């Protein structure tokens, strides 16, 4: 995926460093690399993260997940015009992948981006979403959705920021968001929900929309998916941060297994 864009823009590919860093989990793709040491250019890297901040959210949506896989692009000290052209190239590529012309909705306060995208017939919502590093505002987020009937499906998160006179433009594309987009467009159910259906003997194929209408169902599937990934790295309960996090996830999984009546004895990962 994105191989033609990577070639066209002479993009440097960085290694996926996994979701572990010592005794901590990597919670955002930006944490995975020393971005301040990168030279001017465009970089691409796939990245796994464990996003523990959302564990205690009271209200969630179908896109809620703890373990994430993302495609990431980072533009360092590139002109706004190149960044905007690059972003629209990515949106066109997503349309090719989806085999459909998509209605994009962009939430941003970037005036250059607004002028650029209005000409391309994208729908713009003007709103500032500040981005902070260590409690200091260094830039802004903006978000891109696909409008599909009455649904708004998140597809890309972007961050623009400056640190020590260097300008960064980060683009995150969550693989799970693409899979849910594929479901809403073509009916293909994401793999982690299929696995849950097989594990719990639930006919998820015919009841998927009803299933994801329940926050409890979404929680238990994503908790299970995260535990499977942690198990693959042999991460267990212990006295450090990672071990405490595993314990917390296990307790929540047990709780929502009871609520959703999942027989956890059938889970063999």
Q: Can you say where each PLM-predicted feature lies in the sequence?
A:
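Class II aminoacyl-tRNA synthetase-like tRNA-binding/catalytic domains
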Residues: 1-78, 119-173, 191
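Non-catalytic, well-ordered alpha-helical scaffold segments
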Residues: 44, 48, 65-69, 85, ...
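Active/ligand-binding-proximal structured segments within catalytic/core domains
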Residues: 68, 168-200
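Conserved, charged catalytic cores of large soluble enzymes
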Residues: 81-125
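Extended, well-ordered alpha-helical scaffold/bundle regions in very large, multi-domain proteins
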Residues: 100-102, 237-245, 256-269
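Non-transmembrane, aqueous-exposed alpha-helical and coiled segments at domain scale
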Residues: 159-162, 220-223, 228-233, 243, ...
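Structural motif
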Residues: 167-172, 216-219, 236-245
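A structural-propensity feature for long, helix-poor, extended segments
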Residues: 203-237
